[in-house]
Amino acid sequence: MMEGLKKRTRKAFGIRKKEKDTDSTGSPDRDGMQPSPHELPYHSKAECAREGGNKASKKSNGAPNGFYAEIDWERYNSPELDEEGYSIRPEEPGSTKGKHFYSSSESEEEEESHKKFNIKIKPLQSKDILKNAATVDELKASIGNIALSPSPVRKSPRRSPGAIKRNLSSEEVARPRRSTPTPELTSKKPLDDTLALAPLFGPPLESAFDGHKTEVLLDQPEIWGSGQPVNPSMESPKLARPFPTGTPPPLPPKTVPATPPRTGSPLTVATGNDQAATEAKIEKLPSISDLDSIFGPVLSPKSVAVNTEETWVHFSDASPEHVTPELTPREKVVTPPAASDIPADSPTPGPPGPPGSAGPPGPPGPRNVPSPLNLEEVQKKVAEQTFIKDDYLETLSSPKECGLGQRATPPPPPPPTYRTVVSSPGPGSGSGTGTASGASSPARPATPLVPCSCSTPPPPPPRPPSRPKLPPGKPGVGDVSRPFSPPIHSSSPPPIAPLARAESTSSISSTNSLSAATTPTVENEQXSLVWFDRGKFYLTFEGSSRGPSPLTMGAQDTLPVAAAFTETVNAYFKGADPSKCIVKITGEMVLSFPAGITRHFANNPSPAALTFRVINSSRLEHVLPNPQLLCCDNTQNDANTKEFWVNMPNLMTHLKKVSEQKPQATYYNVDMLKYQVSAQGIQSTPLNLAVNWRCEPSSTDLRIDYKYNTDAMSTAVALNNVQFLVPIDGGVTKLQAVLPPAVWNAEQQRILWKIPDISQKSENGGVGSLLARFQLAEGPSKPSPLVVQFTSEGSTLSGCDIELVGAGYGFSLIKKRFAAGKYLADN
């Protein structure tokens, strides 16, 4: 058995040929004996073993019977082990190790083989202190360049080789892991509970619908166009929120630090600043802004109503905008980059490819700042709701998305190549074309948009003028796939400077320039492509971290179009009486076009008419199409559908003006429809509420009951970032029995509960209660209205949907969302 054990030991350690020799095979016993200094520290038996090295009582490893159990393996890994035989060896055995390894001065080969083991073990075991260069080389040669942990090596002579290997592999792996410090991930998400409340709430119930109308209205130059943040900040909000939640991705830690900061900063935005407010909303949607703003006078959307009427002009009211847009020198300069961004593949809208085929998105252009249409309504909304969203911020994903943080930040998409843009639709979008605009648009600034992952990434600078433009006849790299520029084979002359930013191959393939932020990495979870703001969704097809705008032209010559339904539910609950619940639901439908479409229209002055059909419109009332851009067929017999077609000359003129005013925009949002949904009282509210106050001179008891209502939604989806905010007066001195835990703002005297999400999967099927008792110094308290805020993605309350009619266009993305506007409950 001794020989067998010896053989196994040699195999396990990868002993050299010398060990394999029969002489060395017999020597292991003595080897185990020779390192008497090594064995002595471990146990007296070890000494006996060394002294009686030749005794038959010793086992093949040179240790007496029962020695295995006596060995303290933990000591091998510790400095003591180093001090022990092997650790001490550096002093005397340095040379002897080499000697013993090759041949020991002692005649017995057993000692040699044992020394070999010692040498191997020592370098690995005491690699920090006791390593000998010669020993290391020898070990590498014998072991095959495999470093063994000190403990496994020492163990091997005394234990079976199999055990040694196991220990070795595990310890080696474990030790480096332990030794490697992992950077601490800190998620910064300052939540100013008080700041975001006002922005979170929609317009007053009576003015909610009017507000939408007013928002829709714009000056013709900016008709329906409210600056929409082009940057895919939306993705960053996701990240930001997940990190703030305290779940930053563990690895790699290096990437984490960057992400958390961005998440943290936006939260502290004041409502006064549009961007700040937007950031706050993104990361702090759950956070509540000043209660006063909510309950105090709210800017009435009605104030904007005047503009609404002006804005909604009949087509008969012709304006210079109606003229077919021609590229002006300025537009040519600016547009070419955008055009380059635009798929060059599509010579004309005429050849309809599969509508969904438009997947390779790509509105891009030097215009990093997407300025969808600047809408007065948006501004009004901002003022009214105090939930202001900057164009850049609008691109940010909805609060929920932020929370998803995604859950983790998706790896930057691969550099967008025209091949990728043309050949494949956006990865994430449901249509498949939903990939973000950035990827497909070479024109987008080369600057990495990854920073955009921060709550409010700065817009990438426009293409530097120094960059040479390709001659009109010279196609750029990937030109074929560029979305909106005419195909190379197209009869129409190539756009001026067709490549713009994409001119350089590096800008196209560079991970830093386009791939990081603009690569088409839109994922299904990237619902963040649309930002929800105060009951209004903004399409953010350019996802800095998520990917390029889905609005890029596909290889099938269809123009990509994205649509978003955004609905706001306003409700007022009085006590526990369902009959006293007042509900008002408003919505809007927005179409988004890639910036490069302006060049496409310039090259194709007579594009195919864009016609679409709204499905499940029977629940809609007071439908208000954009009078300057939409025409409706009122003779339809089907009451459940409504068909609309776009006034293309007006649309082209409008998009041209927007491109001139905001050359850095990568896409343009155009409000098409405003509508109000027929409500059925409390049954139409996704979250039913009941509040009960008990006010006494010395204390106040508050109870809030809520219930998730799936019947109100076309598809049951979770309510995200649910917040309950209640002001408490009477000089609160102490909180008692607060369940679940809540945040108390002593300065503003209000309490805030935050629930990440409520759905059927929640405890008790989404039914719950919030309890709190307040000790008062100046009671009794006066009951105040409860303010609730939430958002939801993937469904609408109206159940409306949209489909294209005819050829030439394809939906790259259809977004559906709803959120709480003025959602109140009183005692």
From Swiss-Prot:
GO cellular component: AP-2 adaptor complex; clathrin-coated vesicle; cytoplasm; plasma membrane; presynapse
One term of GO molecular function: phospholipid binding
Annotated compartments: Membrane, Clathrin-coated pit
Keyword DNA damage: no
This protein's UniProt keywords: Coated pit, Endocytosis, Membrane, Phosphoprotein
Superkingdom of origin organism: Eukaryota
Positions carrying Phosphothreonine: T180, T182, T247, T259, T324, T328, T335, T409
Residue ranges, annotated region (Disordered): 1-116, 143-199, 223-278, 315-505
Further comment: Brain-specific depletion by RNAi leads to body weight reduction due to reduction of food intake without concomitant reduction in metabolic rate.
Protein's name according to its UniProt entry: SH3-containing GRB2-like protein 3-interacting protein 1
Organism: Psammomys obesus (Fat sand rat)
